[in-house]
UniProtKB/Swiss-Prot annotation:
The protein's name in its UniProt record: Nucleolar protein 12
Keyword tags: Coiled coil, Nucleus, RNA-binding, rRNA-binding
GO molecular function: rRNA binding
Similarity field: Belongs to the RRP17 family.
Coiled coil feature spans: 40-103
InterPro entries per the UniProt record, alphabetical: Nucleolar_protein_12
C-alpha cells in the first residue's frame, strides 16, 4: 500500500508542477519599418552624393593647381621681361653716352682729343623719350595684370561635342542640297533632250506632209516610164 500511495502522490506532483507561459505580443512601428525597408535607396543616394562632392572637390583642386602653375609661369615671364628691359636700358645708355680720349704728345705741349657720342635712339623708333617711357609704363602695367581664370573643362568638352554635332548636321544638309541640285540638273537635261527629239520628229513629219500636184504628176510620169 505504501508504494502505490507514493506513486499516486508523485504523479499528482508532476502533473501539478507545469507552469503556463504568458503570451508575447510584438508591436511594429510603421515609421521604423518604412525606414528599414527604404534604407537601401537612401544609402545609394548618399553614396551618389558623396561621389559628386568628391568629384567637385577634385575639380576645384585641379583648377587651383592650374591657376597656381599659370601664375608661376606668368611671374617667371614677367621677371625675364624686366631683365630684358633692364639690359636694353643699360645697352642704350652705353651706346648713347660713350667717350673716347686720345692723347697726342708733342715736344712743347700735349693735345688731348675727347670724342663724346650722344645718339638719340628715339629718332630711329619715331618716338619721343617721354612717350616711350609712358609706353613702357603701360606695358608694365599690362604685364603686371593677373591672368584670367581657367575655364571649366567639363563645360569646354560639352561645348566641343555640341559644335562637332552642329558641324556634322551642317555637312549633312549641304550634301543633301548638293544631291538635290544634281538630280534637278539631270532631270532638266533629260527633259531638254526629250523636247529636242520631239521637236525634231515633228519637223520631219511636217516636211514629210502632203505632196503637191506637180510632185504627184512627176511621180506618176516616172512610174509610167518605168513600166514602158
Amino acid at each position: 500500500m505504501g508504494k502505490s500511495d507514493r506513486l499516486q502522490q508523485g504523479s499528482k506532483g508532476k502533473g501539478g508542477g507545469k507552469r503556463k507561459h504568458g503570451k508575447c505580443v510584438l508591436m511594429f512601428d510603421d515609421k521604423d519599418r518604412q525606414d528599414f525597408l527604404t534604407g537601401f535607396h537612401k544609402r545609394k543616394l548618399e553614396r551618389r552624393r558623396a561621389a559628386l562632392e568628391e568629384m567637385k572637390s577634385k575639380l576645384k583642386e585641379e583648377q587651383k593647381r592650374l591657376r597656381e602653375e599659370r601664375h608661376k609661369e606668368y611671374l617667371k615671364m614677367l621677371q625675364e621681361r624686366r631683365q630684358a628691359l633692364d639690359e636694353a636700358d643699360e645697352l642704350e645708355e652705353a651706346i648713347t653716352a660713350t667717350t673716347e680720349c686720345v692723347q697726342y704728345d708733342h715736344p712743347n705741349h700735349t693735345v688731348t682729343v675727347t670724342t663724346i657720342s650722344d645718339l638719340d635712339l628715339s629718332a630711329d623708333r619715331l618716338l619721343e623719350p617721354a612717350q616711350r617711357d609712358g609706353g613702357d609704363g603701360e606695358e608694365r602695367e599690362r604685364t603686371e595684370a593677373l591672368p584670367k581664370q581657367a575655364g571649366n573643362p567639363l563645360l569646354s568638352k560639352k561645348i566641343q561635342s555640341l559644335t562637332a554635332s552642329l558641324n556634322s548636321l551642317v555637312k549633312q544638309k549641304k550634301r543633301r542640297k548638293q544631291k538635290r541640285r544634281q538630280e534637278a540638273k539631270q532631270r532638266s537635261h533629260q527633259s531638254d533632250r526629250k523636247s529636242s527629239s520631239s521637236a525634231f520628229v515633228h519637223n520631219n513629219k511636217q516636211k514629210q506632209g502632203k505632196s503637191t500636184k506637180r510632185q504627184r504628176r512627176r511621180q506618176t510620169g516616172r512610174n509610167e516610164r518605168s513600166q514602158d
